[in-house]
Amino acid sequence: MSTSRPGAQQLIDTVVDPDSFVSWDQPLDLSGLDETYRATMAKASQRSGTDESILTGRASIRGHEVALIVGEFRFLGGSIGRAAAGRIVAAIRRATTEGLPLLAATASGGTRMQEGTPAFMTMVDISAAVVAHKAAGLPYLVYLRHPTTGGVFASWGSLGHITIAEPEALIGFLGPVVYETVNGIPFPSGVQVAENLVAKGIVDAVVPVEDLAEIASRSLTMLSATTERTADPADHPAWPITPFVSRPEPSEDEIATLWSAIETTRREDRPGVRELLRHAADDVIPLNGTGFGELDKGVMLALASFGGRSCVLVGQDRRYQVSESMGPAALREARRGMRMATELGLPLVTVIDTPGADLSPNAEEGALAGEIARCIADMTSLSVPSVSVLLGEGTGGGALALLPARRVIAAGNAWLSPLPPEGASAILFKDTDHAPLLAARQRVGAQQMLEDGLVDVIVPEDPAAHEDPEGFAAAVGATVTAEIEALLTPVD
């Protein structure tokens, strides 16, 4: 990061009215962290001058009261762990309660690798809080700073009413360093740049930091009719932060078992969404495309019936993703399914099974990150029952986009990770040999996710799905039916 670019506190001092900023941040509880992680946090704090990668609070900008969420890239690359996410959610909810407009100034590489899947899933919590804030009629302004990539750009960084960016800021789904580490080749230059995203209609404008106060003030003046204060801030303390707790080092058996499961989900003969429908659905009516002239076979959309219950099904098709990665159009087709379910009052069933979304320049310029964010936003605000099925591979934002349902089912060998384990290993250890260990540390497996409260039900694989595709599909279908029935049953 260029030394000429302001850090979090410097940006706050530049943008807000003098002496108006009041921090909402509570002291962090680091007692649950292991010694190594605690030392890493201490070094990051000393380097950045902040206690976390996020600062939040209340201030005025040219007389307009506003809530602030500001990222600090010098703190572990601005990465978002559970404490940082809890701080963000607390600030958003407090802003909503107090009727304040919200300005988020991002600077982040995405999910914190030290915390893995439990941290990755907090992008859903943050997005849901943003959706609720916007549903209350309150403005949400986003200022994308250098750099903003990964899960931050693919969630709350892409949900603003107005989205502006710092000049020449690096902004993209997968940062170029991570891309080259994972793929072995550099990402084409000139794509993940603020000015290019403006040219492609993804960002509204490029605004220097020194002009941010003016554009924010003008925007808030126009939107002032929607931002009247509804409560006294003293009556609403900040939302409590959920601390991250380090787990014991995984045993050799745990590492081997999880890695065997991951390899099993990558088998060519593993059944996918088509086998699920063939063996478990009563009837299926396939649908096609976005309805706006786009088609991506990486996602299939259908009306389906399980156990006599009709639903809209959106499923990632592992067969088609072998030759072509899932792009933005696939997620727009998924959102068509979400709209259809809402309009028809039908349950929505999503099936997650992907080695990862398309990482090409075309996908970046087609608003892949924004489509992931909008899928998450739509999933968290559905008015109809929803069930998601983590069927096999669950790599990155493309998987997270369809996961946040009311009930989450996982196959016994399924997994979810912010990056392929080999990619995360390459980033942290400069090799892929540590992938099995890192996958276990990041708690990517179905059983770990169940223990962490991220999955509701596991469908056992005994035998593995590829050894009995019909039986596996029937078991998943029966679980889907049971979960739909439970959601449709009135609670006394």
Question: What is the predicted role of each segment?
Answer:
Residues 1-61, 65, 213-311, 315-323, ...:
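Intrinsically disordered, low-complexity segments enriched in small/flexible residues
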Residues 8-11, 84-91, 122, 193, ...:
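General structural feature for long, well-ordered alpha-helical segments within catalytic domains
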Residues 14, 18, 23-26, 30, ...:
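Generic structural "secondary-structure junction" signal
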Residues 21-42, 62-77, 97-104, 134-144, ...:
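Charged, low-complexity, helix/coiled-coil-prone segments
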Residues 57-134, 141, 302-380, 386-387, ...:
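Cleft-lining beta-strand/loop regions that shape enzyme active-site pockets
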Residues 109-229, 352-490:
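Conserved catalytic cores of soluble enzyme domains
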Residues 150, 247-248, 343-344:
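Short hydrophobic "helix-edge" motifs at membrane interfaces and signal-peptide entry regions
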